[in-house]
């Protein structure tokens, strides 16, 4: 369990189209084997420490003739942002993916101060 040491909690969120490979015959739509797409997401304000980030697929357009294989994760989470990562493998053909994200964590509080 992550314990927050601040009385001010921040929640930031967004919804990002990660790719649309059907439009230009991109690798996720035409390729085979292990494939990955990632995007750096920046928070609207800095957190006091790295927040907890939750991702969910809000849209996917996948070929019905192949097995659906997908891995969605956040990596390199810092106080200012994170990497949104989508992976697939095998014969899965992915036309497009949109991922919703939520980050929650402690923010600095103007009423808090450190005694040195």
Predicted regions and their residues:
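Extracellular receptor-binding modules and their adjoining Ser/Thr/Gly/Asp/Asn-rich linkers
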Residues: 1-49, 60-63, 77-116
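Glycan-recognition/cleft segments
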Residues: 66-77
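Short, hydrophobic/aromatic beta-strand segments
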Residues: 50-55
């Amino acid at each position: 369990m992550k314990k927050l040491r601040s009385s001010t909690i921040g929640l930031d969120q967004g919804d990002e189209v990660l790719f649309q490979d059907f439009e230009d015959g991109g690798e996720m739509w035409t390729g085979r084997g292990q494939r990955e797409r990632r995007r750096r997401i920046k928070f609207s304000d800095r957190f006091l420490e790295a927040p907890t980030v939750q991702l969910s697929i809000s849209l996917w357009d996948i070929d019905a003739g192949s097995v659906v294989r997908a891995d969605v994760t956040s990596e390199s989470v810092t106080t200012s942002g994170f990497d949104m990562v989508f992976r697939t493998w095998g014969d899965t053909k992915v036309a497009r993916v949109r991922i919703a994200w939520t980050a929650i964590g402690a923010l600095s509080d103007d009423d808090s101060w450190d005694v040195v």
